[in-house]
Amino acid sequence: MSKEKFQRTKLHINVGTIGHVDHGKTTLTAAITAVLAKAYGGNALAFDQIDNAPEEKARGITINTSHVEYDTKNRHYAHVDCPGHADYVKNMITGAAQMDGAILVVAATDGPMPQTREHILLARQVGVPYIIVFINKCDMVDDSELLELVEIEVRELLSQYEFPGENTPIIRGSALKALEHDVDWTSKIIELAEVLDSYIPEPKRAIDKPFLLPIEDVFSISGRGTVVTGRVERGILKVGEEVEIIGIKNTTKTTCTGVEMFRKLLDEGRAGENIGVLLRGVKRDDVERGQVLAKPGSIKPHTKFASEVYILNKDEGGRHTPFFKGYRPQFYFRTTDVTGTIELPIDVEMVMPGDNIKMIVNLIAPIAMDQGLRFAIREGGRTVGAGIVTDIIE
């Protein structure tokens, strides 16, 4: 029991492996758990324990993902690994597994391949802030010039997608040899662990960000006024502070005159808590589900944005047929649906179920949004896609 307690004192970081099929992402994941379990305690997992990933649902989409955990000298890591390319696309777009940093696995025998590029692009689009490179299968390449070449190609590719290619840490190793406890190669896993600790900074916690609460319900309490309820997404709201009500209608400003949780009055509501907020001088009809309460000036309402979207296939309960420009589904942000129209890239005539695609969306009503906000695409309450805001246009 004491060990559990000890782990909680360590800083917690979320990471994952990305990269081309068969370049050794899962083998590396297994090697990390094996080598670090020996060095710092924890459980070693075999390749097949990680490879048959359980299904999970995120925003109505089924994704196969393996979650493993391990300790380094200074930190505790939660690590995601996906068996298939489509699972990565879905995972990154839905944000099912948010990553503070990613380990890009590139086989020395192949160099960068199409999915290497696609995963780097996705990491850029969905806001994965840091990438570390592990060049795998180095035991199979005798020519050091070839390794140099692979390294140069990877750095160029990272720079192309606005990651700092020149300064990205690159480790050369062999996951398979490390799993066989070959000391020359286990040392590379330890090196990777040290780089994870030093290169990925401590992420900013939700509680330190500006206050935001997506409104789920609105009540009027006679003699007290209007109460909105919801789960605080980020930040802290103290009684007496000003807040803005943003989205759907024109933005208005009011003051929080009370915070309650489980029918008890509090001085403040914090990230992660389900609270009721009493608002001064606000009528029941002025507020609705789908709006947000936010720190004044911290977030703005928008109607037009660029996005990266995954469209469910038929087996996932999605559409059976493609759609074309002029498609008008609902876009579900936080707690509500808003109808919108889409613009497809010039060279795209139609979008098939199972595709991932960039699209520009025009909403009929404004929603409080920042880059990185995730949404579902729905038709009559049924989820047909998932997306992330990559750029705000207006």
Curated annotation (Swiss-Prot):
Positions that bind Mg(2+): T26
Catalytically driven reaction(s): GTP + H2O = GDP + phosphate + H(+)
Record has Cell inner membrane as a keyword: no
Gene Ontology cellular-component terms listed: cytosol
Keyword annotations from UniProtKB, A to Z: Cytoplasm, Elongation factor, GTP-binding, Hydrolase, Magnesium, Metal-binding, Nucleotide-binding, Protein biosynthesis
G3: annotated span: 81-84
Domain tr-type G, residue spans: 10-204
Region G4, annotated ranges: 136-139
Molecular function terms, GO-annotated: GTP binding; GTPase activity; guanosine tetraphosphate binding; translation elongation factor activity
Location in the cell: Cytoplasm
Pfam families on file: GTP_EFTU, GTP_EFTU_D2, GTP_EFTU_D3
Sites where the protein binds GTP: 19-26, 81-85, 136-139
Region (G5): 174-176
Family membership: Belongs to the TRAFAC class translation factor GTPase superfamily. Classic translation factor GTPase family. EF-Tu/EF-1A subfamily.
UniProt name for this protein: Elongation factor Tu
Species assigned in the record: Baumannia cicadellinicola subsp. Homalodisca coagulata
GN (gene name): tuf
